[in-house]
Amino acid sequence: MARSDLSKIKILSKYIYNNKGLKIGLIGGSFNPPHNGHLKIAKLALKNLNLDEVWWLVSTKNPLKTSKGQMSLSKRVELTKKIANHPKFKVLNIENNLKTKNSYVLLKKILPRLSNMKLIWIMGSDNLFNFSKWYKAKKISNLIPFAVFNRRGSPLRSINSKGAYVLGKRINSSRLKLLSISEPPIWGYFHNVNINISSTIIRRSKE
């Protein structure tokens, strides 16, 4: 991918080959709709991982979920911007800009152009159960560190899941603040979080 391809994304152009050492958390999802659980994870990541910013990556479509009942991309971006109203949060639809629908291709395209920065993938433990089903999951784990936050259920089940195995080595809980500057494959688990809300629950409550 040419440098100009990433430069077309206005909000990212200033980061290309710049901001050496800047630590960025990436929280991806359909955000259909975004909710306070997403916001809580983003804020916890910002604080506990010593991040400079958190980027909310609104996906065009989750390959593991049905598109039935999914709001338009523009509507989901709009709602996400409203809930992610924080000076250190940015809402992006990079998948749409770069014409891709999976995280592996997205990371392969942006990481070389943001090589002076430290990026870390943020997700809830519910996604950890399905991580082994992601497109080229093992290769993704070799590209970027992961921070996993406990959601609904036992942390033990998450830590022993197939997705956890694919992610590889788990960092000791006493060293979680170093996760964003650690070399992948590596991941960390934040136990002392319990987020019970989900986009699915919100959608069903409106039916």
How would you label these PLM feature ranges?
Residues 1-207:
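Nucleotidyltransferase catalytic core that binds NTPs
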